[in-house]
Amino acid sequence: MQPWEYVYDLLMPAGTPIGEKQFTKYIYLTLAVPATKEFEEKISKGDTKDLELPVYPVAFNTKPAEFKGDRIATKKDLLTRSGLYDDDYDFEAPIKDLEFKSALVPGYFPLAVLKLYFEGDIDAHPEDYGLKPIDGHKWYSSVNGSYKVTNGLLFNVDETKNSDHYSVLFLDENPKEFNTLNGYGVVRFYMDLKNAPPEVYTKAKEECISAGGLYYYDAREETAYCRLPLNKEANIKASEFIHQLYEMIKSKITSEDFLKNEMVYQLPGPKVIPVKPVIGKTFEEMVKTADKYLLLGETAKEETKQETKQETGKEEEEKKETKQESQEQLFNPFAIVDEMLAEGQPAEAKQENSPQQQNPPAEAKQRQQQEENNAEAPQQRQQEENTPLKMNILTEEESNKSEEGQQPLENNIQTFGFKGDIADFFASLVKDKYIFLPILSRRSPSEYKNAKKQRTFKGEAVEEHTEIPRENMKYAEFRKKYSEIVNKYAVPFMHDGIWAILPGKEQELYKELDKLVQEAQKLGISPEEIEFMVTVLLVPKDAVVREINRQIKEIRTDIDEVKQELQNPDLKKTKIASLKKQLEQKQLRLNLLKDLYSTVTKEEIDKLAGKVKDTLYTLNQIAKYAGQQEETDETTEEEEEEEEEGNDTVKLS
């Protein structure tokens, strides 16, 4: 089964309403917990130890309830097609009434409600999908069978009230944008088989399946149907959704609240016993398949991108040259060379391979300096220029060895101001045991003058220096826009005032900040002031993992405390609303940390191309930007003057 097929069988409508080009659906995602034969046999024998039951996502259509904002789902509204999990259990058996009773299994447990916007009346041609006429019988496009998703919202389910035959869903009033399935679509074709010979029936089925479609024969109408993904992106979109759904389910069934209150079995009498939830076999296999499609999709995108760049290489180089010349005196710390990030080659190597490119004098000088710094390791440098960027995953033993002889952890955390184009900085990194994380500091540009005299900040000095009561309006406007952009694409990390860019959001962030920097310079904010706000954090990989784990444990403790407080029956409505808001924010924070952790620890990181390639880098020689590795508190006045002139390093110790 392909990802697009799974998503269709799970939650997509069979067709579009007749005569409607656009329509919406409220789709209720829940967990079904069927009673397996093994489970029933154990219970019948009185064996109540180590009980397990599989959980599977299922989806229901909903209709508006009497009260505004509420939805009703009934057993007749099941969207998930019955054959989806047939290999695992009899899907129809546990589905009788849609009920949620915490002491009963099997049951249904709410995940979320999706509001999906659809566009129908898709113009599709059978020939484009590999469906050709068979002995005079043609395939035709089904008017009400093709559609695509154009937009979406995700609602949390605050509460459910249940009757014998239906469940009322009380939804969160603040839905979140849900665009994972945007662009996912299906097309349907049909062939009239009245009076057709038997071989046409056989060929129609074979042709549909060989084209990668779902075949269905309606005996009453004597018509064959073939449903196919709308385009190549359908599998990628479906794979992304399956991955998100998996994370949602995993988070649900591992929560302490779920394990204590939901997954219990009522024995005869008052006794209840815990039951361990496990991901159902079919869904677990589907997640693995989706992961493969995501990797293949990223690889295909990368190959297409490289082919396009090869065709237009000269054009791009000319544009880049023009841009460099026009911005030679205009400092822009967020400018990025897309070719380098996409192909994983240092910008320097590209310039050497391009006879048409003329380097500005300043850049040539910088290249010469870099060559001198790397003279001691020519073989290593040559090897890195000719190999794609790849993150070294250290074993625990290797990690421990790498720490021997190093300075303490807090002294390994350093920040470095960008110099010139950011691509030059990336090109100077040498792969070894460090992870490179772009970090944005929220320090005010107005600190610049004080910072020039004091180049070393300690502890939480970053936040202490940001309070400037009479800040110029141009700085205030810049800070406001800057803060909005950073909050959109980054998350606080390790120190107050230090932000780590979210995985996969680098390009979007740089583009927005690129525009903002240009606007700021037009307002008269100097390049030096802007440069002071932009830093890079270098942290050993094992330190990143340890810190993320610490924060995850901390935030989980906070979440449990808030949930416990919500159990208080004497709470006022305003307090409940405030606690729910806190819970939502903490859960979001937890999800972001998990994303960052999975990105940092992911093996074969280079295969994920655009998602993390420009987030994670490793390096060996950083003396050029670190100011000879370390500054001490015993720096003389003469050394401080030299720092002001030639070293933009800012260190957090």
Swiss-Prot record:
Record field: compositional bias (Low complexity): 371-381
Coiled-coil regions listed in the entry: 300-330, 505-649
**Alphabetical keyword list:** Coiled coil, Virion
- Composition bias type Basic and acidic residues, residue spans: 302-326
Q: Where in the cell is it found?
A: Virion
Q: Residue ranges under compositional bias (Acidic residues)?
A: 630-647
The record's region (Disordered) falls at: 302-329, 344-388, 626-653
Any one GO cellular component localisation term in the record = virion component
Q: Which domain of life is it from?
A: Viruses
What's the protein name?
Structural protein ORF653
Organism, as annotated? Acidianus two-tailed virus
Query: Organism classification, top ranks?
Result: Viruses, Viruses incertae sedis, Bicaudaviridae, Bicaudavirus
